[in-house]
Curated annotation (Swiss-Prot):
GO terms for molecular function: metal ion binding. It comes from Mus musculus (Mouse). The gene is Lims2. It is a peripheral membrane protein. Its main location: other. Keywords: Cell junction, Cell membrane, LIM domain, Membrane, Metal-binding, Phosphoprotein, Repeat, Zinc. It is found in: Cell junction, Focal adhesion; Cell membrane. GO terms for cellular component: focal adhesion; plasma membrane. Residues 13-74, 76-133, 138-195, 196-255, 256-315 form the LIM zinc-binding domain. Pfam families: LIM. Adapter protein in a cytoplasmic complex linking beta-integrins to the actin cytoskeleton, bridges the complex to cell surface receptor tyrosine kinases and growth factor receptors. This is LIM and senescent cell antigen-like-containing domain protein 2. Detected in heart, lung, kidney, liver, urinary bladder, fat, skin, skeletal muscle, uterus, large intestine and testis. One of its GO terms (biological process) is cell-cell adhesion.
Length: 341
């Protein structure tokens, strides 16, 4: 299509939302063949632009992620949060794939299948073990015969010990064998290999050990990523796999006000999982200043005072009540039960 033909087509085109035509020089949003004015391409619920252009469509209307969750998404039977994307339906509930796990070994069940066992959802190995316990014996997962003596547990499964040899010395194993990085060792060999290695200098740690960031450290080698001073037992703060002292953590990652987007100087109001300047924390409807002592409800990720909340439609209050109940499970500071308003 030539430039002149395209101009003629756009001259006759109309915005999908307001049905008005487009100015010759204005920017046009094309969403799956539908054309919009830039200011018309907004969430059908909160009328705000879609963050990073991400939206969810339901019955011909487009919603931002937050409003789609609040209006339509099912709630996970484990974590209580909204499920977006793949939903696992099992045990008369909805689940995130990562939340539907064996109740004994915690392995994900979404792609493995599960077995109901006494009202629990279990993976097949755990189900088999529970069934064997009912018989009073373990079942060897290699030869599938009953284990009369103490079993050797390897990767959470029981075995006859004489099925295995030590990965280091080659001796036949007994039930007191130990697993290390997927290999089995007799107890003497394992004890020789169990010395922790420092995450900084990569040398063995023979004295006190600091466990942090998923590694082990010499006390003097566990330091602030900025000033490199040892913490020596003092509090540290973690960010993207690095540890910082309090001073440099605040300098590098200070709280930013959700309302004005400025770094907060002075007191910080922590509410609704966000940080606010004291002067910016107010009712999003009537602009009345709020404190954490006031009763308020979260709506569109902002606080709404008690007086404005009471004017909301009944159906909206029901949705907010459900959202409040889910939030209270996470023990968020100053969350308000809408039943008390």
């Amino acid at each position: 299509m030539t430039g002149s033909n395209m101009s003629e087509c756009l001259a006759d085109a109309m915005c999908q939302r307001c049905q008005a035509r487009f100015a010759p020089t204005e920017r046009i949003v094309n969403s799956n063949g539908e054309l919009y004015h830039e200011h018309c391409f907004v969430c059908a619920q909160c009328f705000r632009p879609f963050p990073e252009g991400l939206f969810y469509e339901f019955e011909g209307r487009k919603y931002c992620e937050h409003d789609f969750q609040m209006l339509f998404a099912p709630c996970c039977g484990f974590c209580g949060e909204f499920v977006i994307g793949r939903v696992i339906k099992a045990m008369n509930a909805n689940w995130h794939p990562g939340c539907f796990r064996c109740e004994l070994c915690d392995v994900e069940l979404a792609d493995l299948g599960f077995v109901k066992n006494a009202g629990r959802h279990l993976c097949r190995p755990c189900h088999n073990r529970e069934k064997a316990k009912g018989l009073g014996k373990f079942i060897c997962q290699r030869c599938h015969l009953a284990i009369d003596e103490q079993p050797l547990m390897f990767k959470n499964d029981p075995y006859h010990p004489d099925h295995f040899s030590c990965s280091n010395c080659g001796k036949e194993l007994t039930s007191d064998a130990r697993e290390l990085k997927g290999e089995l060792y007799c107890l003497p060999c394992h004890d020789k290999m169990g010395i922790p290695i420092c995450g900084a200098c990569r040398r063995p740690i023979e004295g006190r050990v600091v466990n942090a960031l998923g590694k082990q450290w010499h006390v003097e080698h566990f330091v602030c990523a900025k000033c490199e001073k040892p913490f020596l037992g003092h509090r540290h703060y973690e960010k993207k796999g690095l540890a910082y002292c309090e001073t440099h953590y605040n300098q590098l990652f200070g709280d930013v006000c959700y309302n004005c987007s400025h770094v907060i100087e002075g007191d910080v109001v922590s509410a609704l999982s966000k940080a606010w300047c004291v002067n910016c924390f107010s009712c999003s409807t009537c602009n009345m200043k709020l404190t954490l002592k006031n009763k308020f409800v979260e709506f569109d990720m902002k606080p709404v005072c008690k007086r404005c909340y009471e004017r909301f439609p009944l159906e909206l209050k029901k949705r907010l009540k459900k959202l409040s109940d889910l939030s209270s499970r996470k023990a968020q500071p100053k969350s308000v039960d809408v039943n008390s308003l």
